[in-house]
């Protein structure tokens, strides 16, 4: 951890900072990072360029989330994000936002076409079902992700025009999450072999008909335990659904 932070400090321009992504469901790592060992807040206190935390792989209960946000703020980590993948989880983040107002937090809504750990609900469905509730919170920043791999698709969400397909008015988000596409960028330290494999993996064509009767019309699933288009859907060490390259 210390070695990677030192390397990060060498790479970042002066004044640039990063957010630390932590998996809430991985209790060993969570306790190491923010529990009894507190290696992340301690590293921040020593001057590391970390100014926020992304809480992924689960949403804490309300009381725990409020205490966490207050603790992180006190530790000099003002930017706190939660990454829900279901309607219920988004509404939990809304409750958290109301409880900590006027502190601003971020909700990173991630749909079922995201790489790695993923939801079984489509991004558009998640946004359409909760948009009004999220926007009713002045202290909640809305970010969307999962299957956004091109500038044009990102622009649809930033402008809000993604909602037109459902007969809805513009529903713009404040930002987008880019994961898999960023891994293939020239600047990424991903190994060349992995980059090539990502590029060559065909995936599921956007006009393909899904065999999964539960798949939303706007989404393209790889059914659990199966492989489609060079991608497989399995379970991670957290017993959570995860997409992986078939290699």
Regions found by a protein language model. Name each.
Residues 1-137:
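Active-site entrance/lid segments in N-terminal catalytic domains of soluble metabolic enzymes
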């Amino acid at each position: 951890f210390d070695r990677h932070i030192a390397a990060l400090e060498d790479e970042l321009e002066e004044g640039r900072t990063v957010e630390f992504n932590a998996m809430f469901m991985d209790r060993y790592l969570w306790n190491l990072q923010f529990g009894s060992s507190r290696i992340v807040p301690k590293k921040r206190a020593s001057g590391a360029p970390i100014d926020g935390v992304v809480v992924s792989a689960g949403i804490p209960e309300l009381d725990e989330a409020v205490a966490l946000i207050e603790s992180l703020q006190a530790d000099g980590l003002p930017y706190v994000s939660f990454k829900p993948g279901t309607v219920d989880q988004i509404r939990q983040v809304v409750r958290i936002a109301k409880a900590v107002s006027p502190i601003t937090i971020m909700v990173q809504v991630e749909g079922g076409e995201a790489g790695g750990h993923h939801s079984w609900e489509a991004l558009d469905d998640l946004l359409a079902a909760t948009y009004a509730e999220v926007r009713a919170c002045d202290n909640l920043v809305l970010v969307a992700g999962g299957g956004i791999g091109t500038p044009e698709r990102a622009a649809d969400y930033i402008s809000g025009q993604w909602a037109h397909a459902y007969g809805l008015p513009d529903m713009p988000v404040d930002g987008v999450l880019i994961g898999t596409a960023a891994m293939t960028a020239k600047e990424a330290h991903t190994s060349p072999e992995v980059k090539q494999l990502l590029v060559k993996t065909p995936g599921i064509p956007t006009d393909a008909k899904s065999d999964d009767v539960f798949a939303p019309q706007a989404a393209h699933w790889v059914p659990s335990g199966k492989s489609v288009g060079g991608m497989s859907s399995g379970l991670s060490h957290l017993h959570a659904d995860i997409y992986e390259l078939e290699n």
